[in-house]
């Protein structure tokens, strides 16, 4: 199936201006100032006055819903495919948050699989704020290495909701994620929820200083919570 997008203001990602885009099935085959293409059955869409950008990659979405810190009625419902597409998101990484009591990694993985079936590109992290990390297989390393959609582990530090993980335990968690990533040919990252606590990223910096674990293993998020 061919689709020809005409007259869009295109960013690829640099701004190239008014252009046409020819798509065959799920592949972009040409971008040019003007494309003449009249293959029978081609769908032509006029994008005059609209911007065209690459799909957004969002590495932190609570696809099964966030919230839940003000009782069960505060739980946010899970995200739908249309919510993501309307926001221009084409790739997501699903995460658990504070609540790993009424939510779990299994339901997160199932939601990610569903999004993939619907045509999105979706991954997830095993683990949550809790420690020891909740997993599917009983092991962070096995989850990352053996489950296609799992590319790392989520943890929380320096936050009143964190599970008391020590620097030594965080080092072991990062080492497990690193090795599993190598085995499974995955990023093998530790996705860290950063709170506004006193220690900030000190433990992470110490691990980087004192061990051989690569800095790219650590992916802090919500860093604005602690700018000291």
Language-model regions: role of each:
Residues 132-189:
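Active-site gating/metal-coordination segments in enzymes
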Residues 1-4, 10-53:
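Histidine-rich, glycine-flanked metal-binding segment
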Residues 161, 169, 175-228:
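Active-site core of metal-dependent hydrolases
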Residues 8, 21, 26, 49, ...:
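Divalent metal-coordination and catalytic microenvironments
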Residues 64, 98-103, 130-132, 196-202, ...:
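Active-site environment of divalent metal-dependent phosphoester hydrolases
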Residues 55-59, 92-94, 122-126, 151-157, ...:
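Hydrophobic faces of well-ordered beta-strands that scaffold small-molecule active sites
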Residues 62-75, 126-132, 160-164:
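Active-site mouth loops of central-metabolism enzymes
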Residues 37, 47-110:
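Metal-associated gating/positioning segment near the N- to mid-region
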